[in-house]
Amino acid sequence: MAAPWTGALLLLLASQAVSSAQALDEEEVPEGWVLLHVVQGQVGAGNYSYLRLNHEGKIVLRMRSLRGDADLYVSDSTLHPSFDEYELQSATCGADAVSIPAHFRRPVGIGVYGHRSHLESAFEMKVYYDATLEPHPFGETAYSDGTDASRKHAYAPEDASQEEESVLWTILISILKLVLEILF
């Protein structure tokens, strides 16, 4: 009796994983973001690949592991950040994202770490310039060039429900991997 339910559960989890993978390919980007670069690379287990960022302004890095598990470390004080020395980091088992503030000194060092649990990790990193305007602390939008405040774009942080959905997908995919690993 358990075999039909196991098959149905595996089918359900597999379909969720496929729809999750399709959603990653079609990730939503806020209106004020401009894609600057797409970088693909590989990094061995326990090693780092280093990149250098020279673009000014607020930059957003979005990285996803194509294979294995790659983590992201960022620093404006060293060009070789690591898990011991960094200012910003994202070390998740899924998509990694870091917002680099405009005040960071350039060049900014970016370290991509290949987690030891995988022999090799492949990653794709998208580099965005964030041109959205943040509200001024006193209610007025801060414009460096003095343009009309009526033309401002509201700054909206990512929707919390979207973040919760992402965590749910990560958990479901992890469960699917575990079940498949146990069965095969």
Curated annotation (Swiss-Prot):
Annotated keywords: Apoptosis, Glycoprotein, Secreted, Signal
Keyword Transport in record: no
Pfam families (UniProt xref): UPF0669
GO cellular component, as recorded: extracellular region
Predominant place of localization: secreted
UniProt subcellular location: Secreted
N-terminal signal peptide: 1-23
Positions of glycan attachment: N47
PANTHER family: UPF0669 PROTEIN C6ORF120
Protein's name in the database: UPF0669 protein C6orf120 homolog
Source species of the chain: Bos taurus
